[in-house]
């Protein structure tokens, strides 16, 4: 029986032998289509090739593409675990022709692979075609020998494929496998086609038309082929099961979940193990591709998936985080086919562990609220939308998690009510938003780009250049001229000013004309990826369209920014070497004063790791090697070892920066990255690198702030001065300073403990007041009572003092009011065990707390405590408890 990994390899090798380029899977976050949440089909990485916007050095390709469907139009999340074929993560096998072969070859390849390489019996196969595609009908009969009843004509809904409202489109053929009459269901096109007997295993799309805006279609000059075969589906067929979760790969993950939770994989929690197995795959691959859990966008979808799996882990009865313990099992199964998963194993493991640990407590509280609401409904009916929204807003419960919890009880959610609550929150948020301050609309920038074209950037070679004024804007609107004293935006045909992008701030400087106009530039922005927009206020003279101007970048600030930007490249590589290959850049800010670098890592760096990173970067800086730049295609650059930043969009040609020398690297270079920013000429120009902070930005994302050059030198001088001043004040050497600080901290803690103990002793001996009574012990109806007001005592010490007082009394009631040094009040009541049937400490403490402006109080019948914001009413609180005790004593 062929395993999933063997089937994947066999598919790719078959098409390699047919002259196809075997292309590695693209990332789950598509870098060529901002409209897609995740890559959800095998053709997504090739979309621009099909439309002609991109060319590749091959005309035939085959791939096994990672896909996720868990949000937006394609959302399988709710059904995962309950059905045989729904997944959030799946692999799509595909072969593609870009104007090379067409229908005949596509059908022949598919039939040969299925019937010869995979050895499926022809008697179990049937196909569908588009109802008007006589050509496909003839080819299927000729190539396969299928009878007419095995070639089913269907309408456009199922057998005509379109990329969108416009663009390439065409008929498609689907190949179905018949599981046999022991499984209910009918053939495609029949009334009961939704049964499980006939399963689609391969879809062949024949792209032969161009769809136009008016609805008309014209034939493409070079028709293409796009096919897709779900690996999980074909594996199920080849392994003799109609359930994808019974295949060897999925079964291994289900068994791993069951073993880790000490439960039966096929018992009452079978659905939960299926959910965990599926969601482990999607969560792990999304994390490996750079998506981190968050409260918006792709990160929120990831968090929904993770939390749904975590809720099912709780249903199984696992008390500790589970998913992170299953990552090694997943890597064993899929790490060879997808090396990025193996590289990111540490990041995936730690992120899952942290996310589940944080969610556990919230999950418990949220489920308690949900159980209470279900109980109030008698365990049936519809949960109110506002309750579902509260679970979402307060406890982080995605709606589908709540729906999933209700599903097993036969209940549902008021979706309309939930949507209304969500809409109200968004409306409130919009009302509170003051706006971005952006004056020029996007329409203006589009018009200008079409009119004047892209700005040519000359700043790599020089900080000074001549330009022609091609656009002026005041208050976001184009004008013909600008007078002195006016805030304006200036666009020239070419510029040495770097526009803010890639994390690097825009250049500043000055622009002036021959007739005396001076325009100080305070910022440079990039619009539509093409226009360099210089922002400032005209200091003198007049600027007009068509003027020739001299443009000078502030060289000192540019040089400082260069150093910081180059340092981020050295830092990135050092982090990967010290922490692991899972480190990827998640954001940066590079300015003249400092640099900020955000990166994926699941936990704080240790002081030793920070020191090692600094050492590596400064060692490379001291080499003073030349920084080299080459222009290449993105594909060639990455193939040559350049590091591309996740999520960054690259054009047809990119700058490849190589920095530093490294004997360990095959090409002898320390760092190679794609980057369009400005950089130093030699790494020695950075001078020195110093990390000043390392902190958390979000779950799984850390931030380093650092200084270079003069900024780093000034920082070190200041730190040295502070250390020397502190050492001088303590009359020790700077070398002894750390040990002395530790000693002083320990001494302070000891003195604080002694002071607290002395205060308690003083208070209990009567020095802290006793509520106006000379003797601390009073009697009410034969019941002894101690009532004290304790000044300067920490409320957290009340429990111990209550216990001591109860021992002193033997039998009775104790009430203590503590007033801490910050003026906050707290009251505690203790009742000895022999009296708890008559006096309840919780009820007594509520009476005292109310007198001090407090509400409630919690504890046990023998000990209870509450807060009291009005500490000045401490005596009244003591009197209130005395009165309550007196009443109960009298009643007895």
Swiss-Prot record:
Main location: cytoplasm
Record region (Disordered): 852-871
Catalytic activity line of the entry: tRNA(Ala) + L-alanine + ATP = L-alanyl-tRNA(Ala) + AMP + diphosphate
Single GO MF annotation: aminoacyl-tRNA deacylase activity
InterPro entries from the UniProt entry: aa-tRNA-synth_II/BPL/LPL, Ala-tRNA-lgiase_IIc, Ala-tRNA-ligase_IIc_anticod-bd, Ala-tRNA-synth_IIc_core, Ala-tRNA-synth_IIc_N, Ala-tRNA_ligase, Ala_tRNA_ligase_euk/bac, DHHA1_dom
HAMAP family in the record: Ala_tRNA_synth_B
Job description of the protein: Catalyzes the attachment of alanine to tRNA(Ala) in a two-step reaction: alanine is first activated by ATP to form Ala-AMP and then transferred to the acceptor end of tRNA(Ala). Also edits incorrectly charged Ser-tRNA(Ala) and Gly-tRNA(Ala) via its editing domain.
Name of this protein: Alanine--tRNA ligase
UniProt source species: Parvibaculum lavamentivorans (strain DS-1 / DSM 13023 / NCIMB 13966)
Originating gene: alaS
